[in-house]
């Protein structure tokens, strides 16, 4: 039987050691993990465990898309190894000194970046997350307790054994990365209440998982990765930009959190924009759910296809994660901002040549990332120059947007004196 208290205690002890690990040793551990992932014997063990999970998933009637996310191959293991090596090459944030000053009384003060401590990560049927999270937590000096979806229990256990064997060879504690491999859901609730040992919980999955964690946790929870993404096409838009940006945001990877869900178009340019957008997206099998004004424009332009349907009010505010796009014609910037304020918080973009309008949009939209003349798909740690990410936070505390190495740290005040006493 899995003892969550014991796992937590071991993680806390390992976290104290990890906080003191030099960068060179952490990097060596990541290189060892990467090497192990492409070692023939290790890979065979992981792939065998994964094959059992995948077969069970097929027998349970899981969707082809979910089966694909669950599946590991030698090529995917090689890609995970490459990603792990990329984390090793990133700058180590731990120990960074900033906001240094000397006070009038001569005290020397600075902030020093430190690991969060023990990070609990709960995720669904993506075994690659096991290694991604381990790499980021180790590099940032944290310990981690992992709980993957019940569909990938064997895969997660095999990957964790590989990680533990690799890191102990370089002097890191095996307990720095632990996995809860018992599918009992009650153990998740126990983890969410393990505030004696765990410093933060990061869920990676659907809205139901995020809600469950927020409701049950006695530990701070950083949620994100879910949200409705918008593009607003302004009356001053460069029309040549519109189709490529909308296509990229909607079609490139429709099942991810930074994919476009709703297109808002200024009525002054709607008759020019919508037919061009529709032609492009229909060719990629996108279903368009158009409001009354947008539907009229498309009908007048000769579009008559079951792929274009009248939008219901419920189609706005939906994260589709599929080849579906809702479209609304708006009277101008103010209406677009009101719509985004109601439904947005993840990734929202404006297409315009008017710098003043763009600045109003950037200031007014309260989302984790705001884009001007660029696709929402750039809300990603790698794309924003941060390297890998553990999640994309839509919260305002403690982190917002892509959570990379720096976001897995906090800081402490360091005060140095020369026998100072307070008057």
Curated annotation (Swiss-Prot):
It is found in: Cytoplasm. SUPFAM superfamilies: ALDH-like. InterPro entries: Ald_DH/histidinol_DH, Ald_DH_C, Ald_DH_N, Aldehyde_DH_dom, Glu-5-SA_DH, GPR_dom. It catalyses: L-glutamate 5-semialdehyde + phosphate + NADP(+) = L-glutamyl 5-phosphate + NADPH + H(+). Its main location: cytoplasm. Pathway: Amino-acid biosynthesis; L-proline biosynthesis; L-glutamate 5-semialdehyde from L-glutamate: step 2/2. It comes from the Bacteria. One of its GO terms (biological process) is L-proline biosynthetic process. It is an enzyme of class 1 (oxidoreductase). Keywords: Amino-acid biosynthesis, Cytoplasm, NADP, Oxidoreductase, Proline biosynthesis. Catalyzes the NADPH-dependent reduction of L-glutamate 5-phosphate into L-glutamate 5-semialdehyde and phosphate. The product spontaneously undergoes cyclization to form 1-pyrroline-5-carboxylate. This is Gamma-glutamyl phosphate reductase. It comes from Roseiflexus sp. (strain RS-1). The lineage of its organism: Bacteria, Bacillati, Chloroflexota, Chloroflexia, Chloroflexales. The gene is proA.
């Amino acid at each position: 039987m899995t003892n969550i208290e014991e796992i937590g205690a071991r993680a806390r002890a390992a976290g104290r050691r990890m906080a003191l690990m030099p960068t060179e040793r952490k990097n060596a551990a990541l290189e060892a993990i990467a090497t192990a992932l492409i070692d023939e014997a290790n890979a065979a063990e992981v792939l065998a465990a994964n094959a059992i999970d995948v077969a069970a998933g097929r027998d349970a009637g899981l969707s082809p898309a979910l089966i694909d996310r669950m599946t590991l191959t030698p090529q995917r293991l090689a890609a995970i190894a490459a990603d792990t090596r990329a984390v090793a090459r990133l700058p180590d944030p731990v120990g960074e000194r900033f906001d240094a000053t000397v006070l009038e009384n001569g005290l020397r003060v600075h902030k020093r970046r430190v690991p969060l401590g023990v990070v609990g990560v709960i995720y669904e049927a993506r075994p690659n997350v096991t290694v991604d999270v381990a790499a980021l937590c180790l590099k940032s000096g944290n310990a981690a307790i992992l709980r993957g979806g019940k569909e990938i229990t064997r895969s997660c256990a095999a990957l964790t054994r590989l990680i533990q064997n690799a890191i102990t060879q370089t002097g890191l504690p095996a307990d720095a990365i632990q996995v809860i491999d018992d599918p009992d859901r009650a153990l998740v609730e126990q983890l969410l209440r393990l505030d004696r040992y765990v410093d933060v919980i990061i869920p990676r999955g659907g809205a139901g998982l995020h809600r469950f964690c927020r409701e049950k946790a006695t530990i701070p929870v950083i949620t994100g990765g879910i949200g409705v993404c918008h593009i607003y096409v302004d009356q001053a838009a460069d029309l040549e930009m519109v189709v490529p940006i909308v296509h990229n945001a909607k079609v490139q990877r429709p099942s991810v959190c930074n994919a476009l869900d709703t297109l808002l178009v200024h009525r002054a340019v709607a008759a020019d924009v919508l037919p061009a957008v529709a032609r492009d997206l229909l060719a990629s099998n996108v279903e368009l759910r158009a409001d009354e004004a947008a539907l009229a424009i498309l009908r007048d332009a000769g579009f008559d296809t079951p792929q274009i349907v009248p939008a219901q009010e419920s189609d706005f505010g939906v994260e589709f994660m599929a080849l579906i796009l809702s479209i609304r014609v708006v009277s101008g910037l103010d209406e677009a901002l009101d719509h985004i304020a109601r439904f947005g918080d993840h990734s929202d973009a404006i297409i315009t040549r008017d710098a003043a309008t763009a600045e109003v949009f950037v200031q007014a939209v309260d989302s984790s990332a705001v884009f001007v003349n660029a696709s929402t798909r750039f809300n990603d740690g790698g794309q924003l120059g941060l390297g890998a990410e553990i999640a994309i936070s839509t919260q305002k505390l403690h982190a917002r947007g892509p959570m990379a190495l720096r976001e897995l740290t906090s800081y402490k005040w360091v005060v140095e004196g020369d026998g100072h006493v307070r008057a």
